[in-house]
């Protein structure tokens, strides 16, 4: 499958499951400093972001409860993470992919696309709204073309009703009646 620019990014986000079940300790900022990364801080509370001319690395955790604008400390890794809503959706169904000898876990494309349908509605910058919305629709169409309608339905049906309403609202905004009809059967 060939991806268009709507899916490309120079951001790499690492989603850390909570609770973190590891005994491994690694000072990630120190390790990446040798590769030319610098530590930058984002937001009023100082989320750590590792920046390189070609890449930005951020760490995220699923936000639970009433929410907070404070970073979530990850002392095992020498950094902190930004808590964000709806990230549980990305952890629920992952797939292992090997890229240049490195094995990574990625969210299933259906989970990723449905997540984008929810978050584009929360964005404030028009550029990010368009990018997230287009990525969601493009991925969902590709999944439909590949005959993976059941995967899209599975993700949608696994969500709480409040999240389902957000997905439906997003599809209504995009006027994607075909995709909407798949979910509301």
PLM features per residue range, with description:
Residues 1-185:
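Compositionally biased terminal segments of proteins
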